[in-house]
Amino acid sequence: MIFISGLTESGMKISENEQTKQHKKMFELSDKLVLELKESDVIIISVPIYNFGPPATLKAWSDLVARVKETFKYNEDGSRVGLLQDKQVYLVITSGGTKINSKEDFLTPWLIHVLNFFGIKNINIIAADQMALDYEKSIKDAEDQISKIT
């Protein structure tokens, strides 16, 4: 996974002609990820909570798909509008000890905010949380949530 850096920021502000091979490689992956989102009607994101928050790779993914004029745009007043409407998202979230939507869960509200930023509002959460405490119950609860969706 490529992580956002000064190289990425500079690449977003210069013309394609001025981009280095490193810039082009980063944008190649970003373009691919953005296209996947645009072409998908249904998106499933399966993610664990690591130390109360998202894994670094999920943060990197969100940075790579947050592209002006691709996944969001600025209005004249500076406000932002997401460009990925009419998507259905299923978040399958697991944790060892963190209760989903508790004060300790920084992943779920962050990820919902990111998806809303892109214009995605139709989000279903399937939680398999606190698996280290009662694995069988966590799996059963997740299966029950899935059966209500399908």
What are these regions (language model features)?
Residues 1-47, 52-60, 133, 145-150:
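N-terminal beta1-alpha1-beta2 submodule of the flavodoxin-like/Rossmannoid cofactor-binding fold
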Residues 49, 95, 129:
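Residue-level signal for short, function-critical loop segments
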Residues 40-41, 86-87, 120:
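Short, well-ordered alpha-helix to beta-strand connector turns
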Residues 75-117:
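Short, glycine-/small-residue-rich phosphate/pyrophosphate-handling segment
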Residues 24-28, 70-76:
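Short gly/ser/thr-rich secondary-structure transition/capping motifs
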